[in-house]
C-alpha cells in the first residue's frame, strides 16, 4: 500500500506499507525470537519502494538513526512495515520507519498453526533513516 505525493507536488508525506509473515526458519533464539537485523532488512525493502515511487530509482540507504527495539518480533508474527518521507533534499531523503506486529502466532501442541490478530498493533521497531539518490 502506498500514498502518493501531496497535491502541491512535494513528495514529503509519501508513505509505503508492506506486510510480511515471519517464518519459523528466521527464529534464532529461545521463545522463537527473531534478531533485530530482520526488522532492518524490512526497512530497506520498504525504503526501496518509496525511493522508486518518489525518484524512479532504488536509492542507497546511507544511515539509520535512533533505531529502537521496543517489543519482540517472533516467528509466526505478521508484520506491517511503514516508511514515511519526512524531508526531501536535493539528493537525500529522510524517512521515519516503523515495524508493527499485527498478528501473532500462538502455537500449541494441539494447534501448531494457532494465531490471532492483535486488537491493537504492537510497535516493535522504530528508526529514522537517510536514503541517497545517485546524482
Where are these regions (language model features)?
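Catalytic strand-loop segment that frames the active site of acyl-thioester-processing enzymes
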Residues: 1-36, 50
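HotDog/MaoC-like acyl-thioester-processing domains
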Residues: 6-11, 74-75, 84-135
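Compact, glycine-rich, soluble single-domain proteins
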Residues: 30-48, 60-62
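Generic structural detector for well-ordered beta-strands
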Residues: 17-23, 68, 128-132
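Short, functionally important structural connectors and interaction interfaces within domains
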Residues: 20, 25-26, 59, 65, ...
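Hydrophobic beta-strand-centered segment that forms part of the acyl-chain substrate-binding groove
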Residues: 47-94, 107-110
Amino acid at each position: 500500500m502506498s500514498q502518493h505525493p501531496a497535491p502541491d507536488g512535494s513528495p514529503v508525506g509519501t508513505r509505503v506499507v508492506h506486510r510480511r509473515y515471519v517464518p519459523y526458519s528466521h527464529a534464532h533464539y529461545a521463545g522463537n525470537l527473531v534478531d533485530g537485523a530482520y526488522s532492518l532488512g524490512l526497512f530497506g525493502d520498504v525504503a526501496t519502494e518509496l525511493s522508486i515511487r518518489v525518484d524512479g530509482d532504488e536509492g542507497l540507504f546511507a544511515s539509520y538513526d535512533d533505531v529502537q527495539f521496543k517489543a519482540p518480533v517472533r516467528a509466526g508474527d505478521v508484520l506491517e512495515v511503514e516508511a514515511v518521507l519526512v524531508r526531501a533534499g536535493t539528493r537525500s531523503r529522510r524517512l521515519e520507519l516503523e515495524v508493527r506486529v499485527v498478528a501473532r502466532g500462538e502455537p500449541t501442541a494441539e494447534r501448531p498453526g494457532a494465531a490471532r490478530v492483535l486488537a491493537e498493533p504492537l510497535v516493535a521497531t522504530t528508526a529514522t533513516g537517510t536514503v541517497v539518490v545517485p546524482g
